């Protein structure tokens, strides 16, 4: 995965949220607070299911 944006589904509440692929901070679900992405120094570790890649318009 490159450093694009991804729509990720929360494994707990099924909320769909857009996450940056190279997130430098932990990203939590806006609804329930479950961690969706963890920084790894490069590509973020996406913990939810990636629904789609968000393309530039």
From Swiss-Prot:
Binds 1 zinc ion per subunit. GO terms for biological process: translation. InterPro entries: Ribosomal_eS27, Ribosomal_eS27_Zn-bd_dom_sf, Ribosomal_zn-bd. GO terms for cellular component: ribonucleoprotein complex; ribosome. It comes from the Archaea. Zn(2+) binds at residues 10, 13, 29, 32. A zinc finger (C4-type) spans 10-32. GO terms for molecular function: structural constituent of ribosome; zinc ion binding. Pfam families: Ribosomal_S27e. Keywords: Metal-binding, Ribonucleoprotein, Ribosomal protein, Zinc, Zinc-finger. Its cofactor is Zn(2+). SUPFAM superfamilies: Zn-binding ribosomal proteins. Belongs to the eukaryotic ribosomal protein eS27 family. Part of the 30S ribosomal subunit. This is Small ribosomal subunit protein eS27. The gene is rps27e.
